[in-house]
Amino acid sequence: MRLTIVGCSGSYPGPDSPASCYLLEADVGDGEDKRVWRILLDLGNGALGQLHRYVDPLSIDAVLISHHHADHCLDMCGYYVMRKYHPTGPQPPIPVWGPAGTAERVARAYELPVDPGMTEEFDFHTYDGPFTIGPFTILPIPVDHPIEAYGMRISAGGSTMGYSGDTAPCEGLDRIAANVRLLLCEASFRDTDENP
């Protein structure tokens, strides 16, 4: 499993980084039978443009949205346009996993009617226990944020990583972090006003 940090700015994109977006890749097979599976953890504002530096955005197999704040999901709007109106024609739908209401949230962000919204470009699923995408096994875990939010444990190729999403310290974060090889963890909302 390989990780590329596409963007990690909090709340809004910065001059050198878009908002949250993490690319995970895992290989299956060898030689001519080799296939690279790719998933995105979040697709925050500014991330779609930066993603081009690493992979063709049309090669993404699934998108996992941790929660509905713009810095974690807003570039789904641009991705919708890319998949719907690409010069090679409309692209087949890919799975998008997220909290309840993800399909409605991204449709509203683009001022689309909720029905059909973006359902012809994306196959929306609500987190409800573990699931697989190619070689990846994903376990979504609720975390502590002002809105419904999830962190997750992602396993592939014998390794497990954790992604906190946005959260305060909580039991869910402890579960995400337990015995992982790598933990991507939010670091904000400090107790003091002094920043390092």
Regions found by a protein language model. Name each.
Residues 1-164, 168-170:
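Binuclear metal-dependent hydrolase catalytic cores
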Residues 168-196:
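Cap/insert and terminal regions of metallo-dependent hydrolase folds
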